[in-house]
Amino acid sequence: MSIMTGFVIIMAEQIGLLWKRLHAVPFGVYGATQVGKTTLHHQLRTRGEVPKIKERTVGRSRATRKTIKIDGDQHTIRTSDIGGETLYWGEWLKDMKTRKVKYIVFMIDDRHMDKHYDIEQQLCWTFLVDTICSPYWDAINRRQKKKSHDYPVAVGIWANKFDLWKDKYEYEDIQNHPIFESFKDGMQKLNDKGIPCYKYVVSAKSDSEMVYRGIATMIEDY
């Protein structure tokens, strides 16, 4: 290898690193109320143990940049904290559209397994999947047709609070954990649309490495 070739390779690597620092990848983080979305945002912003969140998120906050570093690699992302109550679901759609979200993290916990009558998360998931798969931004009136780049690159379904429920249920492989069972129809619908789904477990409050690795995996593998 000549000196010039080596120099070009080094410069290309440095430009790539600079691009990762300056270019913020738009992530959308959605899910039911009190599932841990705000906690995840705190963990992305300040690495370490996240204090208890006392106030619920109201509406949609301004998107902010977060930089993650893991295994010597670095990525900059941009996320917005949005409430999970039914009246804020429309804000999820606005967030996807206005920020041109490329990756989506849908957060769940084990409430649907702990209390089988609690279907809040399944309803959230159905709304989100239908919104993503619809060829229109305004699905009701069939207006504002989406373009190919309006669909997310991948959707992650993250089972949060793993530290609290990891020993409560029997499973052999985390990818086949029963916590994901209630969401498989939506995952299949997304796959049929050509949008891959990434199943992941995380403890957003206490394990920053799990959070950072999950984000990095979505960016690098999809």
Where are these regions (language model features)?
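Short, flexible boundary segments at extreme N-termini or domain junctions of P-loop NTPases and their
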Residues: 1-32, 140-141
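Glycine-rich phosphate-binding P-loop
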Residues: 26-49
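Short acidic, S/G/P-rich loop/turn micro-motifs used as interaction or catalytic elements
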Residues: 35-36, 85-87, 110-115, 162-166, ...
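Switch I (effector-binding) loop of TRAFAC-class P-loop GTPase G-domains
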Residues: 45-78, 84-89
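Inter-motif core of Ras-like GTPase G domains
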Residues: 89-135
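Conserved beta-strand/loop subsegment of P-loop NTPase cores
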Residues: 103-106, 136-161, 191-201
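Well-ordered, non-membrane alpha-helical segments in soluble/globular domains
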Residues: 118-143, 172-186
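Canonical P-loop GTPase G-domain recognition
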Residues: 164-222
